[in-house]
């Protein structure tokens, strides 16, 4: 809703055009980028978001996921990706079901999965 500069449809974007990609958190991410807000462990990621994350990961682009959006990394990249949702126990169990690894950290820290080039920050989690 708040943007600076040009905004375009994700369907027209390609990961190769970017040096890195950041996904915001908050309720908007949990209900618009994916269905986690409504479906929890049964969530689906919006198709263009999933395509873009997979494309960026395949191109070894750094990916940042904040607040609740690490569930997107956990669902799309799944097996072995290391993420954090802060100290949130219930959601940590959900991402483990998908094959991701959750590491609890303080809200003032970040977690870097160097192998996958994925950075996650808990924000309010």
What are these regions (language model features)?
Residues 3-125:
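Active-site-adjacent pocket-lining segments in enzyme domains
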């Amino acid at each position: 809703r708040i943007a600076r500069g040009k905004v375009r449809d994700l369907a027209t974007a390609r990961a190769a055009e970017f040096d890195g990609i950041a996904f915001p958190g908050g309720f908007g991410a949990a209900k618009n980028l994916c269905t986690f807000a409504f479906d929890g462990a049964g969530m689906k990621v919006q198709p263009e978001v999933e395509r873009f994350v997979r494309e960026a990961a395949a191109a070894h682009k750094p990916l940042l996921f904040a607040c609740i959006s690490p569930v997107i990394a956990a669902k799309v990249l799944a097996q072995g990706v290391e993420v954090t949702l802060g100290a949130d126990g219930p959601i940590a169990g959900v991402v483990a079901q998908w094959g991701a690894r959750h590491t609890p950290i303080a809200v003032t820290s970040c977690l870097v999965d160097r192998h996958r080039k994925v950075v996650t920050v808990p924000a309010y989690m």
